[in-house]
Structure formats: structure tokens, C-alpha cells
Curated annotation (Swiss-Prot):
It is found in: Cytoplasm. This is Thiazole synthase. Pfam families: ThiG. Keywords: Cytoplasm, Schiff base, Thiamine biosynthesis, Transferase. The gene is thiG. Catalyzes the rearrangement of 1-deoxy-D-xylulose 5-phosphate (DXP) to produce the thiazole phosphate moiety of thiamine. Sulfur is provided by the thiocarboxylate moiety of the carrier protein ThiS. In vitro, sulfur can be provided by H(2)S. GO terms for cellular component: cytoplasm. Its main location: cytoplasm. Homotetramer. Forms heterodimers with either ThiH or ThiS. One of its GO terms (molecular function) is thiazole synthase activity.
Length: 260
């Protein structure tokens, strides 16, 4: 399979890019737009709290995003209870943003780890109301399986804490998740540089979502391009199939015909 016909499919929707990007922390809207463009991303996540739903006459980041070109993924960043997350998703739908949502229910302000108990409660309600739910969760295979069984369209385990840039801290859990569920697995949070994104894709993840790694870089536009390349390279390497790891050397050249 080549990358030309290798699509990311979420809830029946097809995407050419496996990189999803956020919209926060940029110096200005112009920098954000340029970074999104060179990233090649087709799915853009937006914190509902950052969108002025009550007064759309005021400038908003949505004024700078071509909604014909990109799929909007409203998220519930900043929510610490199921009730708050549910309310936020309903507001996004009522405002005409989307019912395709990234569900976040955080546990505390220091780690920004997900509160899985509240996450499961929120997911159950939102799925019953017809939302397409992509939950940000811990790298716990059991929780990911529960979310899939409930009807979530994908699972989004963290690679490391949000904004930490620590990379994929527990690749073995990610591998178990990949073996345990059939829905797309998208690493969300913790990516710091291009090699982290490539590793996630080489593991077999279906996509990577990031914000700080790009927006917080010294040159966000250049980093966005690097992430574009890394995700594509990692996916192609996964499809190609890496050689087995061995303890001892294996000569590249045949021993037959040696001189002398």
C-alpha cells in the first residue's frame, strides 16, 4: 500500500493527512494559518472556550480558518467534570461548529491527566445524543477498549502530559492499545519534536495530534513542515515493515567469493 491510497478513516470520513493540529499558543493568527497550511493537516482542533460563540461579530480564530478546506474538531479543553464537557459540546453543536468532537475531561491542573471516570460518563451521554466522540484518554488499554465498546470513533491516548514535549513515554502500552481496539488510535499530547511523531507512527498509530510542539517551537512554521514530513515518514516506515531487532551483527555482503 502506498501513501496515495492510504487514508485515515474516522467514522466513515476519509482524510489524506494523519497529522491533526491545534490552534492555540501562536504569536498571531497569521502565524497560525501559515503553520496549519504547511503542516498538511486536514483536521483542526479548536477549544470551544476560545471561540466567541455569543458574539460572532468580534474577531475570532474561526475567521482565519477556511471551513471548506479543513474539518473542525471542537474540543472541551479546560473541562474538569463530565457535566461541563457535555455542556461545552452542546454549545459547539448549537453554534454550528460541529458534532465531531474531541472530548477532554481533565483530572487536575498540574498534570492535565484525563479523569477517566468523568470521561466515560461524558462519552456515554454524548454518544447517546449523536455526537462523534474522539476521547483524549490515558494510555490505559482497558479504558481505551471501554471507550471503543461504548461507540467512540477513535481513541486518543496521551504520549506524555500535555505540553510536556517528553515524547512517547510508554510505547508498550500504545502497542497493547493498538492490538486491543479496532478504531483508529491517535496519539494526543506529549510530542516534542519530529522524531516523537515518527515513533508514534512507526508503532502503528493511525495519527498524531499536536499543538505545543509546533506553536511553541522557535520557528512554528518550520516545525509544522517537519511534523508533516515526520508523520508521513513514520507511516511509510510502518507500512514498509522494519527489520527485526537482533543482538548480533548480520553482514550485508555475502561471504562467498572472498579474495584469498
Amino acid at each position: 500500500m502506498t501513501q496515495t491510497n492510504d487514508k485515515l478513516v474516522i467514522a466513515g470520513r476519509e482524510f489524506d493527512s494523519r497529522l491533526m493540529v491545534g490552534t492555540g499558543k501562536y504569536a498571531d493568527f497569521q502565524q497560525m494559518v501559515r503553520a496549519i497550511e504547511v503542516s498538511g493537516a486536514q483536521i483542526i482542533t479548536v477549544a470551544v472556550r476560545r471561540v466567541n460563540i455569543s458574539d460572532r461579530s468580534k474577531e475570532s480564530l474561526l475567521d482565519h480558518i477556511d471551513l471548506k478546506k479543513y474539518t473542525l474538531l471542537p474540543n472541551t479543553a479546560g473541562c474538569y467534570t463530565a457535566e461541563d464537557a457535555i455542556r461545552t459540546c452542546r454549545l459547539a453543536r448549537e453554534a454550528g461548529l460541529s458534532d465531531f468532537v474531541k472530548l477532554e475531561v481533565l483530572g487536575d491542573e498540574k498534570t492535565l491527566y484525563p479523569n477517566n471516570e468523568e470521561l466515560l460518563k461524558a462519552a456515554k451521554v454524548l454518544l447517546a445524543e449523536g455526537f462523534t466522540v474522539l476521547p483524549y484518554t490515558s494510555d490505559d488499554p482497558i479504558i481505551c477498549k471501554k471507550l471503543e465498546d461504548m461507540g467512540c470513533a477513535a481513541v486518543m491516548p496521551l504520549g506524555a502530559p500535555i505540553g510536556s514535549g517528553l515524547g512517547i513515554r510508554n510505547p508498550y502500552n500504545i502497542q497493547i492499545i493498538l492490538e486491543s481496539v479496532k478504531v483508529p488510535v491517535i496519539v494526543d499530547a506529549g510530542v516534542g519534536t519530529a522524531s516523537d511523531a515518527a515513533i508514534a507512527m512507526e508503532l502503528g498509530c493511525h495519527g498524531v495530534l499536536m499543538n505545543t510542539a509546533i506553536a511553541g517551537a522557535k520557528d512554528p512554521v518550520a516545525m509544522a513542515e517537519a511534523m508533516n514530513c515526520a508523520v508521513r515518514a513514520g507511516r511509510l516506515a510502518y507500512l514498509a515493515g522494519r527489520i527485526p531487532r537482533k543482538l548480533y551483527a548480520s553482514a550485508s555482503s555475502p561471504l562467498a567469493g572472498l579474495i584469498g
